[in-house]
């Protein structure tokens, strides 16, 4: 057995504590760059990104609202959050394939239940409108998952009117 074989470890893409901790650095960066932020909206697939961001923000500024967004056709964490139980969907369908997750993370579910204020869903048409709006207004090309926070803001899914709000526009690589 080689030295590399001894140290091989499969790292879960979203349900790993170190992955979530690393993604929490985004929350720290938000607080550093916009100290008076009032709300942060984050896309959700399995929940790793929002878990880290929410934990970091709520640890330092518990009054800041942290919201999650999922595609309506792949709303596994939305369902778990609102039903107050961890569960798996039978089917997911969305062009926002990066967040098309049937089973959310167990560790992420625990953190989200504790630190996230609410989770909403957006339709495929709302995601498409957000993608086009980002292109037209910001000259930014985002894939479907990354545009879900903007869709939630554009279509008034959350109580953020008049609040200093950050939409985390992320995506697959």
Q: What residue ranges belong to the model's regions?
A:
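PLP-dependent amino-acid enzyme catalytic core
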Residues: 1-173
């Amino acid at each position: 057995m080689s030295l590399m074989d001894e140290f091989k470890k499969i790292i879960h893409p979203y349900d790993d504590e170190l992955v979530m901790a690393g993604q929490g650095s985004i929350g720290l960066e938000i607080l550093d760059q916009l100290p008076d932020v009032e709300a942060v909206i984050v896309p959700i697939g399995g929940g790793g990104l929002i878990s880290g961001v929410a934990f970091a923000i709520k640890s330092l500024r518990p009054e800041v609202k942290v919201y999650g967004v999922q595609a309506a056709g792949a709303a596994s964490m939305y369902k778990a959050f609102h039903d107050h139980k961890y569960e798996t969907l039978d089917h997911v369908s969305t062009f926002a394939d990066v967040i098309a997750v049937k089973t959310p993370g167990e560790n992420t579910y625990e953190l989200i239940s504790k630190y996230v204020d609410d989770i909403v869903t957006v339709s495929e048409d709302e995601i498409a409108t957000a993608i086009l709006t980002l292109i037209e207004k910001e000259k930014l090309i985002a894939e479907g998952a990354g545009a879900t926070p903007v869709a939630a803001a554009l279509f008034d899914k959350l109580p953020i009117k008049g609040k200093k709000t950050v939409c985390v526009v992320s995506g697959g690589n």
